[in-house]
From Swiss-Prot:
PANTHER family: 50S RIBOSOMAL PROTEIN L4, LARGE RIBOSOMAL SUBUNIT PROTEIN UL4M. Keywords: Ribonucleoprotein, Ribosomal protein, RNA-binding, rRNA-binding. GO terms for cellular component: ribonucleoprotein complex; ribosome. One of the primary rRNA binding proteins, this protein initially binds near the 5'-end of the 23S rRNA. It is important during the early stages of 50S assembly. It makes multiple contacts with different domains of the 23S rRNA in the assembled 50S subunit and ribosome. Forms part of the polypeptide exit tunnel. One of its GO terms (molecular function) is structural constituent of ribosome. Belongs to the universal ribosomal protein uL4 family. It comes from Lawsonia intracellularis (strain PHE/MN1-00). This is Large ribosomal subunit protein uL4. The gene is rplD. The lineage of its organism: Bacteria, Pseudomonadati, Thermodesulfobacteriota, Desulfovibrionia, Desulfovibrionales. Part of the 50S ribosomal subunit. Residues 48-78 are annotated as: Disordered.
């Protein structure tokens, strides 16, 4: 079991918590992390890019001039890719970029990402973050005390107060435990787990 110190929002030690070694002390395999991140980013692509081929461009039905006798190069359509205003050859068409990654691989990658932050000592467990009111300055004050610079905060439940207070702060993101993903863990240098989210994460990855 991995033992981590639990702090309050004043960065005072409040206790210890045991983290499952099967989740937070997994050997990291970069190729698996790369695969899952690539799948995540591919799934986010809209894939709506499109150009018109010669079959899509309007017009071009009539032969511009007769086949022989003019001295000009033969032409069958003024929408040929060779012509100005003609169609595009092999241009991008709408497509789905997503590809399947097995559930076991996705879960393993999430464990590896968590283990990576734990091994780097960039995993912080906070008992809770409670602000007196919805104000950015209150969150910034807590972030400065905790030394958060580029941090992903994981909460057990959605907190509108916390979300609204931190949305104008750059390089900080709030997620609930069920939306935790490999890309965001690797994108943000610090991983801050609210104590209530830890057991939910372990139950999800068990």
């Amino acid at each position: 079991m991995a033992i981590v110190t639990v702090y309050n929002q004043q960065k005072e030690e409040t206790g210890k918590i045991n983290l499952s070694s099967k989740i937070f002390e997994v050997q990291v395999q970069p190729e698996i992390l790369h695969l899952v991140v690539r799948a995540q980013l591919a799934a986010k692509r809209a894939g709506t890019h499109s150009v018109k081929t010669r079959g899509h461009v309007s017009g071009g039905g009539a032969k511009p001039w007769r086949q022989k006798g003019t001295g000009r190069a033969r032409a069958g359509s003024n929408r040929s890719p060779l012509w100005r205003g003609g169609g595009i050859v092999f241009g991008p068409q709408p497509r789905d970029y997503s590809f399947k990654v097995n559930k076991k691989i996705r879960s393993l990658a999430l464990c590896m990402a968590l283990s990576s932050r734990f091994a780097e000592e960039n995993l912080i467990v906070i008992d809770n973050i409670v602000l007196p009111e919805i104000k950015t300055k209150h969150f910034v004050g807590v972030a400065n005390i905790l030394g958060l610079h580029k941090a992903l905060i994981v909460a057990p439940v959605e907190s509108t107060q916390l979300l609204l207070s931190m949305r104008n702060v750059p390089n900080v993101k709030l997620l609930t435990y069920d939306r935790l993903n490999v890309y965001d863990i690797l994108k943000y240098k610090q991983l801050v787990l609210l104590e209530g989210a830890v057991q939910h994460i372990e139950a999800r990855l068990k």
